[in-house]
Structure formats: C-alpha cells, structure tokens
Amino acid sequence: MNVTAVESNTVVLPDHARPARQNWALYLFVIMIPLQNIYVQYLPDFGGGLNFLNLMFIAAFLMALRCGGGLVRGTGVNGWVMLYLAGGVLALMIGLGNVADSTGHGNALKDKSIAVTFLFLAQMSVTDWTGLKRLFLASLVPLPYMFYVLRDQNAAVSAWHYTDHMRISATFMDLGANEMAAFFVTACLVAFGLLIGARVSWGWRAALATAVTLMAVGVVLSYSRTAYIAILAGLAVILLLSRIRLKLMLPALALLVVLPVLMPPAAMERFESISIEEEVRDESTDSRFVFWEEAIHHFKENPLVGIGFHNFHHAEFSSHEMDVHNFFLRELVEKGVLGGVILLGLIWCITRLLWRGLAIVRPGSWYGGLVLGLAGAWVALLIGNVFGDRFTHYAMIAHFWLYAGLAVRGLQLRYAELGAEPDIEPNPEPNLELRDMERTA
C-alpha cells in the first residue's frame, strides 16, 4: 500500500522559532468533561445556551485558533468525520416532522458534535511532541477523582451476590453504568498501550500504571458485561500488535488464571451470565433482540435516509420507547443507507490511521505507545457499540476523539521526523529501513 504524505494546512515552525502556544481552555475542558457530577450540579446555566459545555467549547476553539496547529491533511479522518457531522444535521432535519415532540433533539446533536470536535481541537492545539504529551496528560488528571466517586458509590451498594442495584455511574450522572464502563475501558487500554509500548520516564510509568489500575478496577465494579468482553478483546489486540508480545504472553496467561480469584463474587456472577442463547439469556439481553427487530423493520420502511436523528426511542417507532441498544443499527434506522455508508467510511479511515501509525512508529516511542493503546481501545469501542450506544454520549466519548486527534497530529509529526514519503506496508514489526532513517526526537 502506498502511504501518502501527511501534512498540515498550517506550517509548523521549528521549536526555536517561537514558543508553542498552549490551549489552556482545552486542557480544562479535557479535565472537566467526564465530571458531569460537578458541572451539571454545581456550575450555573445562564440560559440562552450559556452553559459550561457551550462556553468551554467556544473558549477552547478560540484558543485553538491562536495555537496555529491547523488540521492535518492526507489521512481522510477529518473529511469523513465532517461528513458524519453533516449527516447528523441532515438526519435531524428529516426527523423533525416524523415525531410529535422533537424537543431536545437539536441540543442532543449539538452536545454529541461538541465531543466529536475534540478531534479537531487536538490537532489545532498541538504543534509538537511536547504539546501532544501535555494534552494527553490532561486526560489522566480526572481519573483518580472519578475512581474516588466510583468507590464511594460502590461502598453504598456492594453485596456478595449481584443485583441491578449495584449498577452505578460514578461521575456520569446523566448516563449509566455501561457508559461509565466504556469510558474506563478506553482510558485503561490507551494508558496500557503507552505503558508497555513506550520507553518513558519513571514518572510517566507511575502515572500510566496508576491510570491502568484505577480504570481496570472501575471496569470490574461497573458490572457491565459488554465492557468485560470489550476490554479483554482490546487487551488481546494490544498484546498481538506489541513488539514485546512474547515477553507478555506468560504474564497475560497467569493473569487470566488468577483473575477469577481477584474479582468480586458479584462480578464473576455477572461475567458468567454472558450469553446470547435464547434459552439462557436474561431479560436485559433478550430485550435487545426485541429492539433490534423493531429497528430493522423501520429501516426497511425508510431505507435511504432513515427516520431521523434521535427518533427511534419515541412511541411512533419503538413500542417500548427505548433506544436501539446497538449503535450500528441506530445509525441505519435513523440515518438510512446514507448514514451507514458514512459510518463505514469513518470506521475504515480510523482503522487505516492506526494501521499507518503502527507501520512507521519508532520502536519504544511515545507515539508508538499511543497508537498501540488506541488500536485496542478502538476495537473495544466497536465491540461495545454492538450492545449499546457508546459513540454519542459527549461526556463518555470526548476523550476518544481527543486521542484520535492526537494520533492524527502524531502521524504528521512522525512523517516530518522522517523527512521522506516512504512506501510502507503496514507491519507492526520493527522496520529496519525506517530505523536507519530515524533521528532522536
């Protein structure tokens, strides 16, 4: 495969030419966006759209313009994401006349879109490796507090045997346990990829190991069966793509052996209840198949452009007035074939971005660890979306788009280091030709 050059629409000056500007508003936004319990409960809403989410987005965007990073061209990611956002606007307009009450649909699309724009804000705000690392570090800052809230809530409901009362949401007060778990899965896998894939200082290792540990425990205490499957699949992907996979194989097998002993009995009960067989699946799993049948029915009736954004859970389309509980089916039923094609393009370009990144990384580099972890998180996210919607809740998904933006900028910076336009077959194994071309970052 010919790997084309990746460039920015803004020239990045050498480090000695001028100091890189910092997007302090984006740092704060990244830290705060998963902490719904703080800004929803305690920060004022002045009305007229003057709330925390909107004001922070405006501030971060204006400061991003000053940073001079621009958007990276040549990956296809930005273009497909823009199509994805435009498809949402089209679906919103189509759907306004399909339900009796569409109140809140516009705000829902706006909030979801703000999370997606983290992809652009990251690229616009970062012009060098130092800025990239700082922005990632900001995403780790809220994790200890989130774990503290999780532990506090879990202490109030914990029991030996599992009950639905044990499903908590930590800082995601407007969401549920599954969304909380999906955030923890992403954070855990990206941090784990950096921990094993990058040669970093002991300070960084301590921060990454802490993040991995806290988020892994958070996933366990979420009692989300989808998250259990997703994180195991993501870990498997990271191990398979890692250059030290043979060294990690024995510890990984040992962990699988002792994991049932380490996990709380209630979590093991939850894990053992995973099944899609009709005779043994529980009510929660069984209900999803009902929602999916209804979604497929309405998709067949409106195949081209769908029934409209955020419409399926209305009584006009869902007999249970529930969400589809499958992101891919939701895109099809609400946006039709057009939305499905855009989604496939989006999935392909992100997968290709990660594959290209793995092909040219310097062994042991910080960027290599980021792409490695994000590859596992991407697979986990796709799996999680089969049994729910892990892609549209802004508080949960914003950090994923941030990491994707950092991966896009990192790819451009890596090509700038190489000073060439190599013809590379994507291969996670060390590339000797590239290693000879490298210089110390």
Task: Set out the residue ranges of the language-model regions.
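Membrane-interface helix termini and inter-helical loops of multi-pass transporters
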Residues: Q41-Y42, V99-T103, V157-A170
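Long extracytoplasmic/lumenal interhelical loops at the membrane interface
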Residues: W160-T163, I168-M173, A266, S275-E293, ...
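Transmembrane signal-anchor hairpin modules in multi-pass inner-membrane enzymes, especially those
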Residues: M1-I94, V99-T103, N107, T127-K133, ...
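Membrane-interface micro-motifs in multi-pass membrane enzymes
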Residues: F46-L53, N107-K112, F172-A187, T226, ...
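Membrane-interfacial segments
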Residues: N98, V126-T130, A156-V157, H161, ...
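A membrane-periplasm/extracellular boundary helix in multi-pass inner-membrane enzymes
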Residues: R151-N154, V217, L239-E279, E283, ...
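Loop-to-helix entry and N-terminal half of a specific, functionally important transmembrane alpha helix
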Residues: Q22-M32, L85, A211, W355-G388, ...
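Alpha-helical transmembrane segments of multi-pass inner-membrane proteins
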Residues: F61, A86-M93, S113-F118, G131-M166, ...
